[in-house]
């Protein structure tokens, strides 16, 4: 397993090209699995289920058509993007379980900072309750999304992956309806009052990976 960390901001098209090539090499038995930690410049990506109406400000940032699952999401500075090039075939050929493991991995990493991340039926990603915010219009406790998940598989090897909000400009999410969900907001570790660095998050991800996926 290679853990790859890239400083600075990585061009989106270049990242996709790397992932596609690496996934093909993994499927061919020519490369080891790879977890790639990086940040992108501000941009929006549209997953395979994206609705045009959910792109509310199409001129704000570059928009990329992504072949990952899911709807619209934002990437930008202060957000840890985690691209997972893993052999799902040798991990059981169970895509649903693999997505659950990605969610469990994020939840385990957040727990290192005493943040309780939760999953919700019908809402892929990881959520945190906001007791400090008013109830929703439906009278439910407010919840904000702290991490998004969207993957693609080719020959049973995954690519794309996870984005965790560490300290992004949350106003940048206002140009889309994130993941097609209007009732809930977005948050970050810093927004929750934690002085967490990207390096802290990387350590938490590395430490919690083996607990979820087994030894790398």
From Swiss-Prot:
Reactions this protein catalyses: octanoyl-[ACP] + L-lysyl-[protein] = N(6)-octanoyl-L-lysyl-[protein] + holo-[ACP] + H(+)
Active site: 179 (acyl-thioester intermediate)
Keyword Cytoplasm: yes
Residues binding substrate, per UniProt: 68-75, 148-150, 161-163
GO molecular function, one term: lipoyl(octanoyl) transferase activity
One GO cellular component term: cytoplasm
Main location: cytoplasm
Keyword Amino-acid biosynthesis: no
Superkingdom classification of source: Bacteria
Residue pairs linked by disulfide bridges in the UniProt entry: none
Site feature location: Lowers pKa of active site Cys: 145
Record-linked PROSITE patterns: BPL_LPL_CATALYTIC (PS51733), LIPB (PS01313)
Annotated compartments: Cytoplasm
EC class (word): transferase
A Pfam family the protein falls into: LplA-B_cat
Keywords attached to this entry: Acyltransferase, Cytoplasm, Transferase
Note: In the reaction, the free carboxyl group of octanoic acid is attached via an amide linkage to the epsilon-amino group of a specific lysine residue of lipoyl domains of lipoate-dependent enzymes.
Family from the record: Belongs to the LipB family.
HAMAP family: LipB (MF_00013)
Protein task: Catalyzes the transfer of endogenously produced octanoic acid from octanoyl-acyl-carrier-protein onto the lipoyl domains of lipoate-dependent enzymes. Lipoyl-ACP can also act as a substrate although octanoyl-ACP is likely to be the physiological substrate.
Protein name: Octanoyltransferase
Organism the protein comes from: Ruegeria pomeroyi (strain ATCC 700808 / DSM 15171 / DSS-3)
Lineage: Bacteria, Pseudomonadati, Pseudomonadota, Alphaproteobacteria, Rhodobacterales
